[in-house]
Amino acid sequence: IRDRSYLTNHLVRQYWEQGSHILLVDTGNSYQGLCSLIHAKTKGRDGVYFTYTEEAPIAFNPFYVEDGVYDVEKRESLKTLLLTLWKRESEEPTRSEEVALSNAVNLYLSKLRTDRSIVPSFDTFYEFVETDYRRLLEQKRVREKDFDLENFLNVLEPYYKGGEYDYLLNSDKQLDLLDKRFIVFELDNISSNRTLLPVVTLIIMETFISKMRRLKGVRKMILIEECWKALTSANMSSYIRYLCAPVQAA
């Protein structure tokens, strides 16, 4: 295994030096050294390493994009993320719930464009739903059985400031991964965590698909190493299938 890891490190480094975009999903810290080397070599501009520890838990901001472009893929991924947080794995959302969440995301993104004082984050999205979107639902007389706002806010409250997972979707690093060419997601410490794993997997897939769609004429590579345990649920396997379609097409 050590020889295979050494060979893979060598190949991955060669691809990176040739200008490829590389996303690695790993357990076992096989690429930490190479990622640190690239981070140092590029003076911090590249080589992004995501891992989870109690002292420094993994954190993202899926609502932030550097160029301000929220394309159809990005909007869809935000809606899917919210549904993943809200619904149990075996619980299918209704059509009206999907429509309500799509509307909430679109209206929130419109507000970001008109009010530059709002910092894109899960917290400001949650506050928007709790106030502006609530008023809109009341005006439209949307029935609770079509979209249960109180249930949605209650289930997602742990991800809002002061909640158990408030760090997860509110990173203040303002990091857009689109232009980062070497990214490692180390999943060892969360591979059994049924709350964190679906969210992190979604962000991994969205990151790579965004590169596939938006970076033309550039080689992209995703390498899923020794972490099948983290990807065996029905939820995760569907994302792998979703990922494979555009990758094969490319």
Regions found by a protein language model. Give the residues of each.
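Glycine-rich phosphate-binding P-loop
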Residues: I1-L11
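Helix C-cap/helix->beta junction micro-motif
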Residues: Q18, A249-A250
